[in-house]
């Protein structure tokens, strides 16, 4: 059998028995200015 990938699946929920982990934004978005 092929070895499982070291990196977690891109879509949460594919790994059985593991809860989906939240992915925080790498860069905080600035507040949107009103038009």
Swiss-Prot record:
Protein purpose: Antimicrobial peptide. Inhibits elongation of hyphae in B.sorokiniana (IC(50)=3.8 uM) but has no effect on this process or on germination of conidia in a panel of other phytopathogenic fungi. At concentrations above 10 uM, has antibacterial activity.
UniProt KW Glycoprotein keyword: yes
Post-translational modification: O-glycosylated; contains pentose side chains at some or all of the hydroxyproline residues. Glycosylation is required for full antifungal activity.
Keywords of the record: Antibiotic, Antimicrobial, Fungicide, Glycoprotein, Hydroxylation, Plant defense
Source species, domain of life: Eukaryota
Protein name, per record: Peptide ToHyp2
GO biological process per UniProt: defense response to bacterium; defense response to fungus; killing of cells of another organism
Source species of the chain: Taraxacum officinale (Common dandelion)
Biological classification of the source: Eukaryota, Viridiplantae, Streptophyta, Embryophyta, Tracheophyta
Disordered as annotated region, ranges: 1-35
Biased composition regions of type Pro residues, renumbered to the chain: 1-29
Modified residues (Hydroxyproline): 5, 9-10, 12, 16, 20, 31, 35
């Amino acid at each position: 059998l092929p070895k499982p990938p070291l990196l977690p699946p891109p879509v949460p929920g594919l790994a059985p028995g593991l809860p989906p982990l939240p992915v925080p934004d790498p860069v905080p978005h600035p507040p949107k200015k009103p038009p």
